[in-house]
Amino acid sequence: MSTVPPGPVPPPNPLPWEARESRGLIAAFFDTLGLLVTRPAEAWERMRETGDTTSPLLFGVAVCWLSTAVQGILIRAVGMPMLPPFLERRFGQWAAFGGGIFAVKLILAPIFIAIALFIGAAILHVCCMLVGALQNSRSGFEGSLRAVCYSEVSSLASIVPVVGPLVAVVWWIVLAVQGIERLHHTTSGKAVAAVLIPVVVCCGGLMLILLVAGAALLTRFGHH
């Protein structure tokens, strides 16, 4: 008789991406994407809590890579032709050179995306610890990693010009709060606090940098 303890039991109706072996890779990816966009609460409920860190990481990398690729293609296909003639002459050679950089960026992007997802999950997990959101958690760090990776479906909103990045940030916050609440079995208040701490710190840090840079410029020009 085997003495190896049984692994985590997957949900009876698993997330499509977590059953991609039977559903097919492409179909499972887009079914999961659609579920997170249209019925996120159901997606979080159907998600397993432990036993598979590969699936969320692969999904997060794939959806971020897709967003990066589409943004780059749209900029080159739509943005560059709309430039005035004098700017087109100035940036024409740069655009050709930039195409090569873009190709290299797409090749290397999965590595950097995966690293960023792990760092983001670690930061969020520490914030969950600070606010006491892990008291009833059975998933530990894996739950935080899942919340971060699957919430990256929001990055697709950044494809939309001007307002897209802001929508993506707000959407990510909403999804991450739902994910933390579900996967760590915590209250909505603690989930909101855990998610907003790094967001507020990042925004505050960015504003501080801008203020310091602005003050330095004013001081420099004030002496002339």
Predicted regions and their residues:
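Hydrophobic transmembrane alpha-helix segments characteristic of membrane transport
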Residues: 39, 44, 80-81, 125-131
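Hydrophobic alpha-helical membrane-embedded or membrane-associated segments
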Residues: 59, 63, 67, 113-117, ...
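N-terminal juxtamembrane cytosolic/stromal segments of multi-pass membrane proteins
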Residues: 1-66, 70
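Membrane-helix interface segments in multi-pass membrane proteins
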Residues: 70-113, 155-168, 202-224
